[in-house]
Amino acid sequence: MAFAIVAGYLIGALAGYAASRGNRIAVQWRRLIRVQLLCVSAVLSFLAAWRLPAAADLIWPALVTIIAIALVGAAYLVTPKSSERAGRAVLRGWSAIPNPGFWVVPLAAAIAGPVGLIVAVFIDRVMIFFFGFFVWILRRQAPIKQQMRTSWIDQSPLIALLIGLVLNAFTEPPAWTSVALEWAAPLLAAIGAAMFVGSVLHPSQLIPWRPGIRVWLVLIAMRIALLVPLAFIAPNAPIAAVLVLCAFSIPAFYPPQLSVLYGYADSVVAAASRLGWVFAPVGVLLAVTIMRV
């Protein structure tokens, strides 16, 4: 599984780079982003919600989500006043939020086993409720005017999550849903890497990124300071491993994609996309160590 995940990232990154080199694909990139939202993120939301075993399993995902919201709040305080302040603050804070869907979930599958995988998936899905609100803000203040008919596509992960929760309340999830979640990890890695690299290198995002380093570092320091202590009080090793993977996560993949989709271009997002990878080896090393102790 670990080899498949690494291969997925490499293949996806190469595909995203190749796509960025072709003007024809770059023109269609916004449509590809929406296809990914509808066909990948929505399916994962549906499966994870259907397999939710107990409300108690949401405690740790809820704590991580609260920290994510705090990061967006902090980003709002350091974002200059403008007509796009709320939208830019969402993108900046989101850039410092852990990347559960395309990093923590695949790595948890490889390192922390089934328990860690379920916790990681729940973190990703609980955040969807708030990501839906973030998307609403981004659409409302988008420099590129959005059509109402695209709203349901942009919110499809949240809609799918709600459908999965309804099924969870009235039916038992079939066994194949567990297998599908586990083997989705390499696919998530490949698709996530492709869409991320292609979005970062999209012509609209090739802006000076060094001015955004200072704000990004403040937000990352806040993320690490809030998440690492939780790992020490986690009830078991898989949850602790997932928490350190969140603390030292790679950058979130959605801010560059949504920047392309809605017409934003922010130096903090650009800085996070380029520098946010440096902490990832620390998280992987700590997670492996926790599982072996």
Model-derived features: positions:
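Alpha-helical transmembrane segments of multi-pass small-molecule/ion transporters
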Residues: 1-293
